[in-house]
C-alpha cells in the first residue's frame, strides 16, 4: 500500500511541476488504466442494456449461440440423477446375461394374525422386540406393521417360521 501511495505522490509532483499538466495526466499509467476501465464499463453497460431489452426467445437464442461459440457443453439440471439414469439403461440390457445380486437384508412385516392366538403372538413380539407387554399389544393390534428392519435372510426366515406357527401372516420385503 505504501508503494502505491508513493507512486501516486510522485505522479502528482511530476504533474504539478510540468507546464503541460493535462498531457502529463493523460500519459500517467494510472489514468490510462482508469480510462480503459471506464471504457470497458461503458461497453459492458451497453451490452447489459441491449440484453435486458431482448425477449425470452431472443435470450434463449443468445445463450445457445454463446454456448456454441464458447464450446460449453449442455449440463443437465440434476447432474447427479442423469449419470444414474444413463448407467441404469445399459444394465437392463445385460440383466438376462448376468445374475442379479441377491438381496442381503430384509424387512419383516407382520400382515395379520389369527384372533385366537393373539396372546401368543403378543408374547412372541414382546420377546422379539424387547417391548413391554402393553407396547407389544399395541404393536400387534396395529398390524400390518414392520416387525424388524434390515435383518439377514436367515434370521428373517427363522422369525417368520415362528410367527407362522402361531397362525400369523408374515411377509419378507
From Swiss-Prot:
Function text: Component of the mitochondrial ribosome (mitoribosome), a dedicated translation machinery responsible for the synthesis of mitochondrial genome-encoded proteins, including at least some of the essential transmembrane subunits of the mitochondrial respiratory chain. The mitoribosomes are attached to the mitochondrial inner membrane and translation products are cotranslationally integrated into the membrane.
Organism from which the protein derives: Schizosaccharomyces pombe (strain 972 / ATCC 24843)
Subcellular location: Mitochondrion
Keywords, alphabetical: Mitochondrion, Ribonucleoprotein, Ribosomal protein, Transit peptide
Example of a GO MF term: structural constituent of ribosome
Subunit structure: Component of the mitochondrial large ribosomal subunit (mt-LSU). Mature yeast 74S mitochondrial ribosomes consist of a small (37S) and a large (54S) subunit. The 37S small subunit contains a 15S ribosomal RNA (15S mt-rRNA) and at least 32 different proteins. The 54S large subunit contains a 21S rRNA (21S mt-rRNA) and at least 45 different proteins.
Matches recorded under Pfam families: Ribosomal_L12 (PF00542), Ribosomal_L12_N (PF16320)
InterPro entries: Ribosomal_bL12, Ribosomal_bL12_C, Ribosomal_bL12_C/ClpS-like, Ribosomal_bL12_oligo, Ribosomal_bL12_oligo_N_sf
SUPFAM superfamilies named in the record: ClpS-like (SSF54736), Ribosomal protein L7/12, oligomerisation (N-terminal) domain (SSF48300)
GO cellular component terms, semicolon-separated: mitochondrial large ribosomal subunit; mitochondrion
Transit sequence range: 1-33
Primary location class: mitochondrion
Record-given protein name: Large ribosomal subunit protein bL12m
CDD domains with a match to the protein in the record: Ribosomal_L7_L12 (cd00387)
One annotated GO biological process: translation
Assigned protein family: Belongs to the bacterial ribosomal protein bL12 family.
Amino acid at each position: 500500500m505504501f508503494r502505491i501511495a508513493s507512486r501516486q505522490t510522485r505522479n502528482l509532483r511530476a504533474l504539478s511541476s510540468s507546464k503541460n499538466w493535462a498531457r502529463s495526466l493523460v500519459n500517467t499509467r494510472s489514468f490510462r488504466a482508469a480510462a480503459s476501465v471506464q471504457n470497458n464499463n461503458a461497453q459492458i453497460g451497453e451490452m447489459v442494456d441491449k440484453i435486458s431489452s431482448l425477449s425470452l426467445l431472443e435470450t434463449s437464442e443468445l445463450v445457445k449461440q454463446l454456448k456454441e461459440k464458447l464450446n460449453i457443453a449442455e449440463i443437465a439440471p440434476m447432474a447427479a440423477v442423469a449419470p444414474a439414469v444413463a448407467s441404469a439403461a445399459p444394465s437392463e440390457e445385460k440383466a438376462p446375461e448376468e445374475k442379479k445380486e441377491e438381496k442381503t437384508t430384509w424387512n419383516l412385516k407382520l400382515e395379520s394374525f389369527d384372533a385366537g392366538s393373539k396372546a401368543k403372538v403378543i408374547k412372541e413380539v414382546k420377546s422379539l422386540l424387547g417391548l413391554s407387554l402393553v407396547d407389544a399389544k399395541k404393536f400387534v393390534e396395529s398390524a400390518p406393521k414392520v416387525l424388524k428392519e434390515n435383518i439377514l435372510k436367515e434370521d428373517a426366515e427363522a422369525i417368520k417360521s415362528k410367527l407362522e406357527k402361531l397362525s400369523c401372516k408374515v411377509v419378507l420385503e
